[in-house]
Structures are given as structure tokens and as C-alpha cells.
């Protein structure tokens, strides 16, 4: 969800920016540390950033009159975690606002909090939880992470709208109304995004399994299995 300039009251713009700031600061530190330890992660990080950029540009009109789009953050959150993804997401949002007119600058903190912070955080928790069971392959785990990232992003967006514009004084009523509007198109979009993200993750695991192993995304046994299939 890209909030345009002037959509949210300035007080709420500041509030959401302050909430997003710690995640972004930590993410910048995390990226610096990661690159200093192994610069080979840079190409994959760039791919994840490009994936977010392209996917999140797809605007799909809703029958309710709003617009919905994928977020693309589930893949990056699965590979690099929520902190790194928050920075990638912020960079993408700045470029989209500056070059393409998607979203505004005064509302950047609010958009970043929903799309670049909370969505990736939820995706990472789901991905890690599924992978720790030892029963869920990479592709399906990323699928679930991407679906959750998308849905949580729009739930937070609905909350942001509800807090700024309660219906007859009721935040809950406004939240449910906004969530219902988004859900019509957003749920199918999240499933499609999940499928694409899962396929991309599986492909990357086949061509660059050693990078994903270094990131702790796949195990040594999974790498051996991939290499044996290619032999």
C-alpha cells in the first residue's frame, strides 16, 4: 500500500516514522556487517531488492474501487531476515515515490512500517517456524512467508487508516471496513505472489545453493541433495 502525501495527518506520519526507525537503523547495521563478512551475498540481495521493486509496482484495481498490489517482501525476508528487508523495502519505496510517483514522502514512514517492517517480520517468523520443523521444503515455506507478508502488510495498512479516520469514533469499525475492502483482491494476490516467490526461491536454491547455506536458509544436506541431482 502506497500512501500518498497528505493522506494521513502529519501526527500519524511522524508516529509511524518513529516506530519504523529502529528497525531501519538496525537493518542498515545488519547489511553492513553481512557485506563485510561476505560480499558474495550482494548479488542475491540485489535480486531480492529488484523483486520487491518490480512486484510491488503491479497495481490491480479492486471491485470496491481501491487498488491492491503484491509486496514482494516475503522472498527477501526468508533469505535475509526482516531487518535487511526493511532497508531494501525503504529504498524501493523512496525510488518509487521519487521516480514513479507511487506513494509520498510525508507518509513514507507509515508505508515503510506496514510494507517494509511488519510484513517482512511476520514472513520471517512464519518461514523460520516452518523450516525448524524439518518437514517443510524451501519452496512451500517461502510460499507461506510471502502470503503472510502480503496479508499482514494490508492488515497494518487497515489499522493505520482506521486510527487516522475512525468511523463514527470507532477504530474497530473503520479497521474492519478497510480490511474487508482490501481482502476482496488482496487474498488472491497474496496466493499468486506466494506461488511466484516459492518458485523463485526453489530456482535460486538450485543454481546458488552454497549462498543460501551460508545464510542459514538451507542445510548442508539440502545442498548435497541439490548438487547430486545436478551431477
Curated annotation (Swiss-Prot):
**Gene3D superfamilies assigned:** 1.10.1760.20
Q: Mind telling me which InterPro entries this protein's record contains?
A: CbiM (IPR018024), CbiM/NikMN (IPR002751)
Membrane topology of this protein:
Multi-pass membrane protein
> GO MF annotations for this entry?
cobalt ion transmembrane transporter activity
What keywords appear on the UniProt entry?
Answer: Cell membrane, Cobalamin biosynthesis, Cobalt, Cobalt transport, Ion transport, Membrane, Transmembrane, Transmembrane helix, Transport
Q: Does the keyword Nucleus apply?
A: no
- Taken from the record, one Pfam family name reads CbiM
Q: Which residues cross the membrane?
A: 6-26, 41-61, 79-99, 107-127, 136-156, 172-192
Cell compartments where the protein resides: Cell membrane
Would you tell me the Gene Ontology cellular component terms? ATP-binding cassette (ABC) transporter complex
Role this protein plays: Part of the energy-coupling factor (ECF) transporter complex CbiMNOQ involved in cobalt import.
Spell out the family assignment given in the record's similarity comment.
Belongs to the CbiM family.
The record ties this protein, via PANTHER family, to: COBALT TRANSPORT PROTEIN CBIM, PTHR43627
Quaternary assembly:
Forms an energy-coupling factor (ECF) transporter complex composed of an ATP-binding protein (A component, CbiO), a transmembrane protein (T component, CbiQ) and 2 possible substrate-capture proteins (S components, CbiM and CbiN) of unknown stoichimetry.
Protein name (Swiss-Prot/TrEMBL) = Putative cobalt transport protein CbiM 1
Q: Which organism is it from?
A: Methanocorpusculum labreanum (strain ATCC 43576 / DSM 4855 / Z)
